[in-house]
Amino acid sequence: MIESSQPGTLYVGVSTKMYLGYRDSLDWLAAVRFEVDARPALKAGRVVPFVIPSFPMLPAAGKILAGSPLILGAQNCGWADGPWTGEVSPSLLAELGVGLVEIGHAERRRHLGEDAAMIARKVRAADDAGVTPLLCVGEGSAAGAGVSGAETAAAFVHQQIQEAVDGDWNLASRLVIAYEPVWAIGAAEPASATYVSAVVRFLREMLGAHSPVAGSSLGELPVIYGGSAKPGLLPMLEGVSGLFLGRYAHDAANFGKVLDEALALDAILPEDKFHQGESTRGKFVIPG
């Protein structure tokens, strides 16, 4: 489980999906480790890097990343131990040192039949095992330009989150949300910074109606953006908690560039800047 972070913490992460073979994955993990080690400011924990390699890489990845600020993630999990051939339980992932697990990615929803009930079981099982769910959400098609389109998309994403926690907003407070518009995944360019910022702003307003713990608000839940994300995007976003990178970060140097952008944002933004409805450029608080 990822520990509660300081005010203003940013996430920068990447999944390799199934693009890299075993040897290439080892080389890539070593290169990412080099990029992180070259930035000692990451040790402060205000910018949190994470990597999500394919399942067979997890034991080796744990060794390569040992002693670094990098959080190891998994691309999927089952929802129970026992007779589930081919699945990997969250409890086993925890034993391997996995800190977060991707759940509900659009590709699994579309091609592998993952529905809301299955995703909810996985989210609960991961949380019970002490592994932070990285819940992937996003509208299937562009909802339209302007305020109305962004609000429609936010309402859809809010519903996905509610279904994933089965209405348990206390559980929701322990999630990291990856907002990935399905139409932006694998596209030539990410969704526009203006659109993403507007969707996240509306989503925070909707989540803010839920207060699972006295003194906390789900409007402060970490929401990172994914969907053809690449260097140069993060400084343009407002109210977004970081980036979930894909193919652009398979070049470890690009991962380093985004880490630099996050560290620069952290250096110029005051800790008390995170308030619902304000321009925050990635500021967030994980409710304790």
Predicted feature descriptions by range:
Residues 2-288:
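Active-site loop-to-helix "anion-binding N-cap" substructures in soluble metabolic enzymes
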